[in-house]
Amino acid sequence: MAKEGNCPRASILIITLWVLGFLTILVVNLGFMVRTQLQFADHLQDRLKMYYLARAGIERAVAELYKDENKSYDSFNEPWANKEEFFKDFAFGGGFITLKYQTGSLPGQEDITLYGIMDESGKIDINSVPLDILTILLERIGQVETEEAIDIARAIVDWRDIDIAVLPGGAEDEYYQGLSSPYKCKNGKFQIPQELLLVKGMTPEIFSRIKGIITVYGTERVNINTASFDCLYALGLSSSLCERIIKFRQGSDEACGTEDDFIFKSPSDLMSVGSLFTDEAAQINTLISRNMLAVRSDIFRINSQGILRNEKGERSREIICVLKRQEEKAPKILYWHEN
């Protein structure tokens, strides 16, 4: 039989063990919480550092753009457009900055990666492009049958114009209000290219094919020094002529953005691209007479990546900026997006 004096001692021992167990669990949990908070703080610090690296890339690009000495034309072989040693993996502030973009090549070839600033004026502005060119774009690049391309083009014009008159095959409020999830026809300019997906007849498949050659940023004339094969083809030029323009522009090394590139200093210089057939000369003259071609730019896209490389691997943040270059003034920001 146990002595009565041992019971309090046993109780004290049990309580002590319970307290020690509780304190152990508490310490472990506190340690886990502190470690998690430190990791989270470290993560936030890295995100902030990558953000400011990307911001620094934007400023670096703007400075290079404003050093451009060629005021009469803009092309791929200028430093702002393609300068790998300046825009690829530039070490700064404990990280790296990269500015790069892709431009279309000839059919059957992979897109070309360049390090620098993208000329947004080398694209077709869906806010101002005429109906007939819009139809050609949808037919040739969007791979849409002619009749369907005409209807989608008319629906796009109905979406962007300010009136409520419906073009044949187009659409205004009556159509959009009758959808299962109704909305209004905008009757105003497109603000982002993805807005096309709201237009009658436009599908994700068609949009994915045309998105690389369209813009919404007021470039009514296409820069023939930076326009891709697809963009030139969408303007109504023949496939053969588009290929000759690209090769003529690339020079003898057949590379984009190098010293031997040929630069068009006037839209009429297109007439010097080899021997033109009568219909090809007519195609060029038509675009020139409609004031749809240019050789310089004012609107540019900057894709700036802030990159960190350490024991955690490689991580990055990207800022996409579209700006308008202005003489004697700071650039005007037209679009800003942080990934």
PLM features: what roles do these ranges have?
Residues 2, 11-339:
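Compositionally biased linear targeting/interaction segments
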